[in-house]
């Protein structure tokens, strides 16, 4: 259900297509973001279920937030809705900044 930032980086580097889904709020996304991600705030996930389902048919969804709590909740909910091709990035964007890309601001 979870994947580390290092695993995400390796999968992207190998050429695997992934959809990186940021479930933080727009203000958080403005503060710090990862390149080529799609912002779908947690509160809007149910309204975007069909879009997420279509995306998951095309490639795995990697869901992230600030520290990994909200994203894990979203992944659990998506799986309850029948979308299995999704994982939460453990530690969120904060861990990504610490381990992968220090140019991403930490807050």
Task: For each feature predicted by the language model, list its residue ranges.
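Rhodanese-like catalytic fold shared by cysteine-dependent sulfurtransferases
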Residues: 1-18, 26-60, 69-107
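Short, surface-exposed ligand- or partner-binding patches at beta-edge/loop junctions that are enriched
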Residues: 64
